[in-house]
Structure formats: structure tokens, C-alpha cells
């Protein structure tokens, strides 16, 4: 048994530079002299020898005899391709530098037009690399970007580029669609804060052509440069939509953005929509990458801006006829075409027509009504566009002083930053859903709304319920009377909770909502806000917001209970 050392001996002893074979096998503390103390004590001093350390494969074989000859006898060194020009270097300093590249040639495949011939062990060769050829290590480390000196100008769109390793590093199509929520949020906020839109540019933009303005949303020349592009297609389009709050432009027709069935959409995103790869002949890419690009073009939805004539809000004077038509044509009972799901059948039309809450509240009064009557999915992008239009009205105005305009503009920018912090997550959660999934989410919302309306009837607190966009879907009669409104007037058309708040309360609400929209699963918020009556009087309320989330943990319904402060 090994003698137990005292603390002083343990402190004074020093490890040996290299242990002997016996001490190494027995895990003993060896000494520097030979034979060591352990071998002398055990009468095996004649066999006390230093342990031979293993050589790392990529190191030279100067310390181990025969290492080079063993490597040259391996089958890998017998593989040959076309010859490479070599030159003999007489310098001794070059000899030591060339030893490592020759030994490490097995780790990387040689170029197609080169090979390594068997060299005599007495000679040291230097491989001549042409100055124009790029080392493979640089190609592996450089991100997929195009050389700006070989870009095609927009004046000659029919000119083709010869894609070579000297002027182009082949981009990976998937690299255009990868990003994180934190990075994309930071990009959006930086873009929104750095862009300075003046009143004159807004007025001139409002009177110009719609297609031209859609291009101006990217840059004044109609193309985004490398520094102005986000790393996500969704964030590029998201920034365009948020920037529309300031740029009053005539937007393109919105297309379904939260479905994956966009094959018939001619406005789907493609790599050619980016300015830095425009006019590139993508036929020069290999076939697998072209298939990936085509798959992304067919599967990614397109986020467009604004209203068109057929989707614009109707005149309030014709609301009765308009909703009667919606009741007759768009919401029907169970069909008679055999058994099957009455909600999802062959006659169901997935449209973006808006159905006001006054109709849905009267149509779905029990849980069985959700299954016996046809249900339509809710088109959230159109609701966000209506919110955009409302925010421009609330924080706009030409009869204000420059100080008041600047104050309203600063509040608008705060709201923009808060929306940009959570909206990309909402899009990412719903972008791969099909129409049936959206119907399921709407059915979940309507089913939860039935329970909350029954609870509101048993509760004495004035209550308002709205979607995550702020669109009101239910209000109690006592709350409507406090605000000098009719509940039917607030539900017969698209109305937002922000229409009933003052400017500071709107900013406070978005601050609170942004904190619980993503990540934070807190379901109850207590605060105090000011509400506007129909006669423009302000009433201060203390309120409690209850958040109901969907299966993606995204806010689905916000239930606000208000108590006036006397």
C-alpha cells in the first residue's frame, strides 16, 4: 500500500516531466530520476523507462522514426488525379512551414485540376497556388454574398453572368429565410427609428402612383441595398406594413397571408424580389437548390398592404343592406349534400369578407350552433390594416401646431416599436396553418366568447371584450351607457377599443400588451386608463385585463373589466 503523504509533503512535491511505464499504468506519482523511487522500492528498477507518448496525426514525424514512411504507405496516398505544378524551395525556414500542409492534405479534397504526386523524402516541395484562385478555407468562412464589382446594372437586364468562383460565391437559398425573433425585432426597430419621413414626402407619396410607392417603401430607387435588407422575407414585408402607418400609400391588394395554400398567388416572395440579387440568371444554379427555391416560393405567404376597392370599408349609411347581404350569402345553415363536417365542406368558401360581431353574436348563441351552422375564419391581416388606418387618424391632423404634431408622432413611433416587438412572432406561429386550422382557431375563440359572455352577465362590472388586434367583439350594456354609446353601434361594424381611449392610454395599453404578448404567460393585468365618451368627455377607470390564449400561447381574447373612479 502506498505511504500516505503528509500535507507538507504534498505541498512540496512536484510532478515529473514524464512518468515511467509502471507509474503511468498504476497512476502513481513518478519522480524525475531514473530509475524512479517507485520502481526502486518494488525492485523493478531495470524496467523503469519513460512512457512513449502518442503522436497526433496532423503533427510531423520528426520525433518518431518511420512516421512519414508509414503515412506514405497508406492507401489514401496512392490516389492520384491530374498533376500540379511544384517548385523546390531551398530555404530551411520554408521546409518547416511546408511540413504541416503536406501532412494535412488528407483532410480536404484536392481541387479537381490538381493532385499530389509522391515526393522523395529528401526533397521539400512548395505547391504554387495561382493568385486568382481563392483558398477553400476562405470559401467555407465567407458568408454567401455576391461580389459587388460583378453586379449587373438594371440598365442591361438581358445580360447573363458567368458564375465562377472568382466573381460569385454560390448563395444558399435557405440563408435568405433564416432569422431569430430577437434579431428581426432589433432590425425593425432600428429601421423605424432611423427613417425620417417628412410631411411633404407623405403628401407627395399620397398623390403618386401606387406601384411606384410600393417600390418607394423599399428605397427611393425601387430597390433595397444590402445594408437595408433584413435576413427574413417576413420581416421585410412586416417593415413595409408598419412603415405604411407613416407613408400614406396606395397599397397592393391583400392576399391570404396566414395560410400555406398560396400557389395561385402571383405576388409570392422570391429571391428576385431582393435588390442585391436582381437580374441574376438563376438557371445557373444546380438543380437541387433551384427546387428548394421553388418550394419556398410556393409555400411562403405574401404579406401585402392596405385596402382595395372591393375590400374597403363600406359606407355606414348602407350598413344595413350590406350586413343583410352578408347574412344571406355568406352565413348559411347546414348543407344537404350528404354526411360530413357541416363546418368544413365542399361549399365552404374561405374568403376575407368581414362579418361584424353583431351578426356572429346573434348567430352563435349556444355551443351547438358552432357545429350546426357554417363558421368563417377571421382574416387578421385585414384587421391589422384597419388598425393602421385608425392609428393614422388618431395620431394625425393638419390643424395642429408643430409641437403637437411632433408629440403625436413620437407616440406613434413608440406604438410602432411595440407592435414590431411581437407581430413577427404572431406571423411565424400562423404562417404554416391551412384553412381548416384557421377555422379551428376561430371556433375556439367563439366557444370561449360564449362562456365569457355568460360570465359577464353574472358579473356587475362593466365589461368589454376584444381580439388581440383591439377589435371589439362584445360589450355589456352598462359599459356602453357609461360611454354614451349603443352596444349595437359598436358591434355592427369594425370598431377598436382604441377609439374609446385617449392618446396616453393607447400608449400605455400597447406597453402592457407587448410585455405579455410573447414569452410572458401572465394572464391578468391591473391598470388605470382614461376612456372617451361620445361627447368627448374623459372618464378615468381602474380596470383589469384578462388574457385568453390560443394553442400557440398567443393572446386570443382580452376581457377588460372597468370600474369608474369617482
Curated annotation (Swiss-Prot):
Residues within the DNA-binding region(s): 20-48
SUPFAM superfamilies: Zn2/Cys6 DNA-binding domain
Coiled coil: none
Biased composition range(s): Low complexity: 253-270
An example molecular function term from Gene Ontology annotations: RNA polymerase II transcription regulatory region sequence-specific DNA binding
GO CC annotation, single: nucleus
Keyword Thylakoid attributed: no
Keyword vocabulary terms for this entry: DNA-binding, Metal-binding, Nucleus, Transcription, Transcription regulation, Zinc
Domain of life according to the entry: Eukaryota
InterPro entries: ERT1_acuK_gluconeogen_tf, PAS_13, Zn2-C6_fun-type_DNA-bd_sf, Zn2Cys6_DnaBD
Location of the protein in the cell: Nucleus
GO BP: cellular response to starvation
Keyword Zinc: yes
Region (Disordered): 63-92, 250-270
Family classification: Belongs to the ERT1/acuK family.
Protein function: Transcription factor which regulates nonfermentable carbon utilization.
Protein name per UniProt: Glucose starvation modulator protein 1
Organism (species): Candida albicans (strain WO-1) (Yeast)
Lineage: Eukaryota, Fungi, Dikarya, Ascomycota, Saccharomycotina
